[in-house]
A protein has these predicted regions:
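A signal for specific C-terminal beta-sheet/loop modules enriched in small/flexible residues
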Residues: 14-17, 51, 55-57, 69, ...
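Phosphate-binding active sites in nucleotide-utilizing proteins
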Residues: 32, 37-82, 87
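Terminal amphipathic alpha-helical/low-complexity segments used for targeting or macromolecular assembly
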Residues: 1-33, 37-40, 45, 80, ...
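A short linear-motif detector with a strong N-terminal bias
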Residues: 5-7, 13-15, 26-27, 32-33, ...
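Residue-level signal for inorganic ion chemistry
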Residues: 2, 48, 154
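Glycine-rich hexapeptide-repeat left-handed beta-helix
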Residues: 74, 80-236
Length: 236
């Protein structure tokens, strides 16, 4: 067979799978723009937008919405979850679980071992790897959670990361329930942030904190009055 014939056969096979899903009640924005490269199981009232790819074993629970241009592999997406556009979910060997009513993306990345509870929010340009997030935890912008255990109702600020690798071994970060982590924080594992605590924006935390404590670890601000900026040297 020529590459052209193989491509035509693949398109016919994919359309066959799309039609079978629609017979089951799945709503596809365009059956001609769907790729199922494994086993896709859909419960009632599922919607899938265009240009989505499903690999390995994927289960979409009742009422799940998948936005355009998503890639989902080896994952269980529970009822009522919404996967916004351009989200990449790769369960590989460890799998990925997204809880009921969770909101993921757009432009989010869930890597192997990501286990998200009900009503978790993972926003744009957030990466989660080998981490557990309990009900209602939120990381909405530009963040990294690797090898972490995150409690209920945690708010994880924009630009914050868990520093989980010391150059030789991976270490775990524990963020207990009701913690607020400010923007641009670094949590150097192994470390535990106590329940109800607050981490001030811009802090680098290398020691565990007590429950309910405010933890701030950053350089003192210095403001120099009447500062004159360097001037460009004229080109010869």
């Amino acid at each position: 067979n020529s590459p052209q014939q193989l491509a035509q056969l693949e398109r016919a096979f994919q359309l066959q799978q799309a039609n079978a899903l629609m017979v089951q009640g799945v709503r596809l924005a365009d059956p001609g723009r769907l790729d199922v490269r494994g086993v896709l199981q859909c419960d009632a009232d599922v919607e899938i937008d265009v240009n989505c790819i499903f690999e390995g074993k994927v289960h979409l629970g009742e009422g799940v919405r998948v936005g355009p241009n998503c890639v989902i592999a080896n994952a269980h997406i529970a009822a009522g979850a919404v996967i916004h556009a351009f989200t990449h979910i790769d369960g590989e060997k460890l799998g990925v679980t997204v809880g009921e009513g969770a909101l993921i993306g757009p432009f989010a990345r869930l890597r192997p071992g990501a286990q998200l509870g009900a009503e978790v929010h993972i926003g744009n340009f957030v990466e989660v790897k080998n981490s557990t997030l309990a009900k209602g935890a939120k990381a909405n912008h530009l963040a990294y959670l690797g090898d972490a255990t995150v409690g209920e109702r945690v708010n994880y600020g924009a630009g914050s990361i868990t520093a989980n690798y010391d150059g030789a071994n991976k270490h775990r970060t524990v963020i207990e329930s009701d913690v607020h982590v400010g923007s641009n924080c670094v949590l150097i594992a192994p470390v535990t942030i106590g329940a109800g605590g607050t981490v001030g924006g811009g802090s680098t935390i290398s020691k565990s904190t007590e429950p309910g404590a405010l933890s701030v670890a950053r350089g003192k601000q210095v403001s120099i009055a009447n500062w004159k900026r360097p001037q460009k040297t004229p080109k010869p």
